Amino acid sequence: MTATGLDRPFDLLLARFITTRPMRILSGLQPSGRLHIGNFFGMMEAALKLQHEGEAYYFIADYHSLTSIHDAKVLRENVRELAIDFLACGLDPEKCVFFRQSDVPEVTELAWILSTVTPMGLLERCHSYKDKVAHGISASHGLFAYPVLMAADILIYDSDVVPVGRDQKQHVEVTRDLAIKMNEAFGEGLLRIPAPRIREETATVPGLDGQKMSKSYNNTIQLFEEEKALKKKIMGIKTDSTAVEDPKPIEGSSILALYKLVASEADYDVMVADHQRGGIGYGDFKKRLLQATWDYFAPMRARRDALIADSAYVDRVLAEGAAKARTIARATLTRVRDAVGLG
């Protein structure tokens, strides 16, 4: 080592890590089709709060989507829809970095390097592979090695925190294992070891039939449903046969559960009281839910219309986000390449 201390990448690495910076938070979003309100209240709302907590990086996981989407037109449309929807719902490019995963190709090279230290048994123990195959997704190497690419997604941005649901905690644990293996093999401190932040489980958002809202059950209300379609769906929510004059059950009411998400606390309390008192039919409650849902998403709907009309803005946001992300990714990949002997 010379007096400059720059002959080994780890000296630069140590200096960089000692430098304080805001907590870096990473969140990946799969472009799997049109979003519904279950997605919004179950995932999007929490994800949007991250941009106020630190240095937030959001990416659209289009590489990952190739394991289940084999139609180029559909994938492009899904990516576009997701970008527009997240921006419409409040993602602020001035407060976060928002980009397409595939616009940062360095992540695939890091994934390959990580794969060389990944034990087969580690991947075989991942429940996500078995779960997805059980749900009809064709078994493939990409699906099997999914956790390695996810680890590369996390590690290439020196992420500190990765918010995940409890069902995805294992993916962050795999990432930590691989980072530790790389550090042990090629130099302590080579890769930052991230920590999972387990999202508090939100209440299950009920679908039109009372089951959990899911595309699999064909019971969803799309996030930006047209007014006529929204009315048809909400007025068609399944209810019991309680007579108009009788009190309505509170427990298990899909109408009340949905109304609580979109109405003010005061309005929700009024609807609960009206259920308990009786004398009001389900049709009236559904109309209140319809109006509250339409009003709740009105500002987002207006922003979405503006974004659709200004496609150049959306392109610019994604391009600028990718440029920022690649700056970090290139630095990480350079030090990893040097450490393993490729530099």
Predicted region positions:
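Short helix-capping/linker segments at secondary-structure and domain boundaries
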Residues: 120-124, 156-163, 263-271, 301
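Conserved nucleotide- and phosphate/pyrophosphate-binding catalytic cores
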Residues: 20, 170, 176-343
